[in-house]
Amino acid sequence: MKRIAIYADSFNGKVGQSLAYMNFVGLFGIPRLVTPQDDPQEIVDSCDALVIPGGADVNPLRYGQVPHPATGRANVYYEFMDAILAPKFVEAKKPIIGICRGMQSLNVMFGGTLYQHIKGHTQGSDRTATNQTLFTPSGKNYKVNTIHHQAVQKLGTDLEMIGATQVIEGCNSLYNQSGLVSVTGKDDKGKDVEFYAFVEAFKHKTLPIVAFQYHPEEFNCPFAIQEINKVLNPVIQEENEQDRQEVPQVTEEDTKEGN
């Protein structure tokens, strides 16, 4: 099985990670908690992938902005591993999965910026409530639990949006709406809709990197599982695609000839 590194968090004088994250990572391999005290090169050499989980706000100084008054205190543990560990996985071209803060941090690593304060989005919200619609390029929609104090503003270099959620009323009060992404999709009834959106998921165009703004670990989101498997098992995905293309298509004429 694959060994998948995931940032450990520090709280109440202890180091650990939530059961939801550990169980979710366990769907894809064996989780390994990593800390700033670990040797980053040993982690890269011994692990097949890295998960950057959710957490506190990303330090705005990393993307050249002055902290907003409502911007929270950065997680020093996570910021250190963002600087020391994550770039080594990028350099090694090993898979990286970002969730919530992890997505924001990856965006910043590739030169992107963030909206620092999203009104109405707090970590005190119900993390299991799938109350927003995720629009994807395939046209298939998913219900997701999007709760995030910050969000992608400008996408980083070579990052491509693969999911978007509609900006809820009141969220854009602190920044220029022209900076938001305009998206056209289909609603739950199949009707075309156009709206301002948050980037809710992205992938890297050439590297095995995928990230989600929402929290797929709370409900084992099928879209996230599908996209994560694409970066963790690209050979299997390519073989499946090839198999689907090589399956003969039976037509009505074929069935008539066989009778």
Where are these regions (language model features)?
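Catalytic beta-strand/loop module used to bind and position nucleotide/cofactor moieties
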Residues: 211
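N-terminal beta1-alpha1 cap of cysteine-dependent amidohydrolase-like domains
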Residues: 1-99, 108-115, 119-143, 149, ...
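Active-site loop->helix "elbow" adjoining a glycine-rich segment at hydrolase catalytic centers
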Residues: 101-103
